[in-house]
Amino acid sequence: MTSEQPIPDITATPAWEALRKHHDQIGETHLRQIFADDPNRGHDLTVTVGDLYIDYSKHRITRDTISLLVDLARTANLEAHRDQMFAGAHINTSEDRAVLHTALRLPRDAELIVDGRNVVEDVHAVLDAMGDFTDRLRSGEWTGATGKRISTVVNIGIGGSDLGPVMVYQALRHYADAGISARFVSNVDPADLIATLADLDPATTLFIVASKTFSTLETLTNATAARRWLTDALGDAAVSQHFVAVSTNRRLVDDFGINTDNIFGFWDWVGGRYSVDSAIGLSVMAAIGREAFADFLSGFHIVDEHFRTAPPESNAPALLGLIGLWYSNFLGAQSRAVLPYSNDLARFAAYLQQLTMESNGKSTRADGTAVTTDTGEIYWGERGTNGQHAFYQLLHQGTRLVPADFIGFSQPIDDLPTVEGTGSMHDLLMSNFFAQTQVLAFGKTAEEIAAEGTPAAVVPHKVMPGNRPSTSILAKRLTPSVLGQLIAVYEHQVFTEGVVWGIDSFDQWGVELGKTQAKALLPVITSDGSPQRQSDSSTDALVRRYRTQRGRTG
């Protein structure tokens, strides 16, 4: 099913043409000049949402650019689409589904009727079940088959059932307070599971199998191998004490041997990449507890309310999404670097890759017609200062335009003094954060370098051209609430871009064919006798070489 109403071509609108002309006018105007012409922009082009201070002044935009981008958003009916999403309309048109990840963090006393049900009651029933279970786990009331307390939960999932929990656990592991750690298995490569289980005791290990349908190939393959590891040590009867499921398929969960009382459900209106604040976050709740998890959800809700109510001119996710679109469609940027100056956010860029690229990596609009402009930013990145010694060279002096998001915190969870005694290691980290955004924006001219006595032959090599844009996001401290706020800002950026491009940001048909083809190829590479010839010579040769190196005939 596609959208019943044709979607106007945004690139054929006066608002798009006005932005094109505006780009021609401001051209390559340097950020040095933009700041000189508008010296207060460093204070004015900021927005505070919850605990997040967001500075977007170091972008190659003027106040006129912002006004024109807002006009574009209104031309695309962003606010109406936003209201439809929050109301539970079926805006995932290709699958005829509501899109209600925002309902996962509504307070208990809220009401949202969708398809005849108050989904808030359903959400909190699951949250209560999660809380009761994790309370028992954390207190030691729930034990393994031998009576020992559980000390490690292993989440088995893939995609949204893995990337979100991995990232959040890494970010909030300092809040783990009950002696329970979490590990994660996603890859069907056996090395992943083998390494994860190598030093674990089956008697103190609990597995969470996270699969909506309970039929995902990678997840069920790993879960079956994990069950074998457990039963080899403790016997078949131990499965019910050492496995729980996050799924909607009670029959398959029961067939696997998991007690159906230990199923934590979710709904088809929650996409995998938007599900870390659902039962998919059970491993996180087990580690940090239900109260900290509630704080995590409250952070999402703070930004949800801001996005739902603020006009585009002062709406942080909308503005950042529109700025991203400005670079993608008018300045030719193809990627965005995500640079958290926090070791705890080591997995944040990987998480955002799925959130953004699976959502907006589309070439077909929601009405089934082809898009008429580039869509989908390529997200990548690394924590600072590691990235500075890896790829910042390209950001500073390369030929490609790469807008960057810098994320930092004023107060670390832990800190150490520097050897010199001037501040702390965290101060040193954040001095790099501020310096990098400054140098990217303003650079250093040949004249400035020559004035320092640099040999003339070396001057061109040391020129820092600047005019490289960035967003700075600063919060006091990385808490569960702040992490929820940060994720929600990016969720709603994705939505904003998708609305303007006219695409369905909530399906992912592009991942299906490869999975189907893999199932078809598995018997080809494992069967006895000569394999079926493939339709292309490359795949055929690869399959035959693989079979030979595995000692199989044909």
Swiss-Prot record:
- GO terms for molecular function, please? carbohydrate derivative binding; glucose-6-phosphate isomerase activity; monosaccharide binding
Extent of Basic residues compositional bias = 544-554
As recorded in UniProt, its EC number(s) are: 5.3.1.9
Query: Record's GO cellular component, any one?
Result: cytosol
Q: Which domain of life is it from?
A: Bacteria
**Which catalytic residues are annotated?**
E358 (proton donor), H389, K515
Q: Which SUPFAM superfamilies match?
A: SIS domain
Q: Which reaction does it catalyse?
A: alpha-D-glucose 6-phosphate = beta-D-fructose 6-phosphate
- Describe which pathway this protein belongs to, using the record's wording: Carbohydrate biosynthesis; gluconeogenesis; Carbohydrate degradation; glycolysis; D-glyceraldehyde 3-phosphate and glycerone phosphate from D-glucose: step 2/4
Metal-binding found in the keyword field:
no
Record GO biological process:
gluconeogenesis; glucose 6-phosphate metabolic process; glycolytic process
Q: Which key words are in the record? A: Cytoplasm, Gluconeogenesis, Glycolysis, Isomerase
Compositional bias ranges of the Polar residues kind = 527-540
What family, per the record? Answer: Belongs to the GPI family.
Protein name in UniProt: Glucose-6-phosphate isomerase
Classification lineage: Bacteria, Bacillati, Actinomycetota, Actinomycetes, Mycobacteriales
